[in-house]
């Protein structure tokens, strides 16, 4: 039920993926591991920033305390969705490149492990998108949600370069 914990679990999964790529002992796997580490640093940092922004406004990280944030903070919803999609490996983002290279590298040496990794990626995407849906969608009925402040110019200025770096 804690947004920060969910993102932290995602980080652990991504580092496991980096390890698998490194131990594939292929050029693709090693390159994918390095790319995934850099990408993960940007994306996870941005996701923790997203949690910090809503925590600063509501003083809770509990998923159940949110819902309907999209109606009140549309710019935030865009950036949070982009970071979530980059985290799950949306094509066109740095998350995709690293994950694809690791999968190609591990497929060359251990195809069965690559199948398990691909399954793990799908399950990871499911729980990250579940988190996004629970926090962002629904009807903004709670007074705390309805009164949330939109992103400030300073916060948008922070998000824009991070978003640009996550694109390939």
Task: Describe these PLM feature segments.
Residues 31, 35, 47, 129, ...:
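Hydrophobic face of alpha-helices
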Residues 18-34, 38, 105-113:
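Helix-coil boundary and interhelical linker segments in multi-pass alpha-helical membrane proteins
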Residues 22-25, 88, 132-135:
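Transmembrane helix-loop junctions and nearby membrane-interface residues
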Residues 128-143:
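Transmembrane alpha-helical segments of integral membrane proteins
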Residues 1, 24-25, 59:
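Short helix-capping/hinge motifs at transmembrane helix termini and TM-loop junctions
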Residues 8-14, 18, 43-124, 145-166:
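Interfacial and helix-entry/exit segments of alpha-helical transmembrane bundles
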Residues 1-12, 31-38:
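Hydrophobic alpha-helical membrane segments of integral membrane proteins
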């Amino acid at each position: 039920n804690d947004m920060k914990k969910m993102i932290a679990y995602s980080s652990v999964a991504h580092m496991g993926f980096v390890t698998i790529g490194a131990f594939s002992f292929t050029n693709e796997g090693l390159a994918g591991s390095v790319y995934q580490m850099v990408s993960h640093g940007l994306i996870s940092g941005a996701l923790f920033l997203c949690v910090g922004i809503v925590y600063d406004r509501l003083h809770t990280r509990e998923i159940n305390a949110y819902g309907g944030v999209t109606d009140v903070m549309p710019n935030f919803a865009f950036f949070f969705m982009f970071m979530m999609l980059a985290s799950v490996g949306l094509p066109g983002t740095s998350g995709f490149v690293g994950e694809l290279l690791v999968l190609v590298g591990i497929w060359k040496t251990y195809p069965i492990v690559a199948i398990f990794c691909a399954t793990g990626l799908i399950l990871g995407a499911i729980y990250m998108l579940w988190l996004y849906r629970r926090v962002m969608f629904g009807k903004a009925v709670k007074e705390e949600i309805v009164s949330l402040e939109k992103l400030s110019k300073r916060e948008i200025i922070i998000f824009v370069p991070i978003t640009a770096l996550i694109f390939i």
